[in-house]
Amino acid sequence: MAYIEGNTGKWEYIIGLEIHAQISSKSKLFSGSSTIFAANPNSQVSYVDAAMPGMLPVLNKHCVYQAIKTGLGLKAKINKYSVFDRKNYFYADLPQGYQISQFYYPIVQNGTMEIPTSTGDLKTIRINRLHLEQDAGKSMHDQSPHYSFIDLNRAGIGLMEIVTEPDISSPDEAAEFVKKLRNLLRYIGSCDGDMEKGSMRCDANISVRRSGEPLGTRCEIKNINSIRNIIKAIEFEAKRQVDLLENGEAIIQETRLFNADSGETKTMRLKEEALDYRYFPDPDLLPLVISDELINELKANLPELPDQKIEKYTKEFGLSKYDAEVIVADESVAEYFEKAANECNPKMLTNWLTSELFGQLNKASIGINECKITPSNFAKLVKLIENDTISGKIAKTVFEIMFETGKAPDKIVEEKGLVQVSDNNVLNTVIDEVIAENPESVEGYKRGKDKLFGFFVGQVMKKTGGKANPTLVNQLLKDKLDS
C-alpha cells in the first residue's frame, strides 16, 4: 500500500473513480443527431437536443446494447428493470434544465475488475454501478472578450458512467484501473477511450486517513483528461488534504478542478448531495425492461476480452505474463500477433515484435495498422531465422528493408544474396584461412587467453559478410582451436 508522508506520520489514500465513457454510436442517446467529433459548432443538434417545447426523447437501442456488453465485460449484474431519471440543475450548456440519467435503478450493478499492484499481486476493484446518461453541451469562452457561446453538438451524446467503490489505494492503482478499463471498452467496442478528444473522462473522489481510522471527508476532482494527470491530480489533492489536517483545519467537501499546467487543484464549487438535484423518474421515458434472451445473445457475441487473451497467450503460446500483457494492451497489436503466431514460433515472434517492430513503429510515430509488414511476412521472417536460412544479425537487415518497402523477406534474402552459410566444407575453408593468417592469436588462445575466441568468430563472420551460421562457426572453430 502507498502512503502520503506527512509531518506527523503516514496517511492512507482512499480513492474512488467515476469514469464517463462516451458510447460508440453514430447517433445520440435520445435523438438521431450525429456524434462525429470536431464538427462545426451546433451542426449536429436536433430539436430534442436543443430542448424545443414538445420534443420527446426516443431511446437509442444500440446505446443500451453497448451498456449491457460493457456490464458483461465487467462481470456485473445486468438489471432487467432500470429507469431513467431527471437530474435537475441549471447550466447554460444544458438547455433542458435537467440531465437524463439513471439514479435509482441503473442498468448495471456490482461488477469487478482486477488490477496489478506494486507487489505484483492482483487486486479486485469493485464496480458499484454503470448507468446511462446524456452528455451536456460545451461553453466556449475564448471566442469573444465580451460574450460566451454555447455549442450543443455534445448535448445528448450517450455516456456510460462507471462508478467504483473506494477500493483504490494509490495514484498508480487509479491509473492502472483506468488503463485496464479503457482497454476493455476498446475490445468490446463500446467506447474508443480517446481521452484527448474527451470521449473518456475521469472524476476522482479522494480522501485521506490514518491507518485504522474512519473514512475522511472527500473531495471530487472533475474531468481529468489523461492517465498522467490522474496520478498528478490525486497526489496533489491528497497532499493538500494531509497538510490541512496536520495543521488542525477541516476538509471541506467540495468539487475541485485540476490545472495540468500548475499541477494543482482549485475549488470549483461546494459538493452537491443527491437531494440537491431533485431526482425523479423521467415521465417521457418508459422503464427499460431487458430480457434474458437479449442478455444471453449479447454475451454469446462478445469478443475475446483482454484477460482471456492473456490467459490464452500464456497457456497456448507459452509467453510470459508480462509479454502477454504488453501485446494485449493494444487490440490492433494483439490481432496482428495472432495472425502471425499461427504461422511461426510465437515466442520468437514476440521477441521480434516487442523489440524490433515496436522500436521502428515508435521511431516512425505510426501505429501497427500503418505498418507495411504484413503479419504473414513477419511470420516468414521468423521462420527464416528459425530454420537457419538467415542469422539473427542478417535478419535485422532484412527487417529494416521490409519495414521500408513491405517486401517479403524471402525475396529480399534472394535478391541480396543473404542466405546463411551452413555448409561445413565452406566454413572449414574460411576457418582454416583465419587460423593461418593469425598464428600469434592462435598461440595466445592455446596459452589460455580464451577471450581471443571471439576474435576468431569475428574474423570468420567478416570474411563471409556476416552470413556464416554463428552456431556452426562456434562449433567448428572450437574443434580446430582445441585440437
Curated annotation (Swiss-Prot):
Domain of life: Bacteria
Alphabetically ordered keywords of this record: ATP-binding, Ligase, Nucleotide-binding, Protein biosynthesis
InterPro entries: Asn/Gln-tRNA_amidoTrfase_suB/E, Asn/Gln-tRNA_Trfase_suB/E_cat, Asn/Gln_amidotransferase, Asn/Gln_tRNA_amidoTrase-B-like, GatB, GatB_C_1, GatB_Yqey_C_2, Gln-tRNA_amidoTrfase_suB_CS
Gene Ontology molecular function, alphabetical: asparaginyl-tRNA synthase (glutamine-hydrolyzing) activity; ATP binding; glutaminyl-tRNA synthase (glutamine-hydrolyzing) activity
Known partners and oligomeric status: Heterotrimer of A, B and C subunits.
NCBIfam families: gatB, PRK05477.1-2, PRK05477.1-4, PRK05477.1-5
Protein name: Aspartyl/glutamyl-tRNA(Asn/Gln) amidotransferase subunit B
Gene giving rise to this polypeptide: gatB
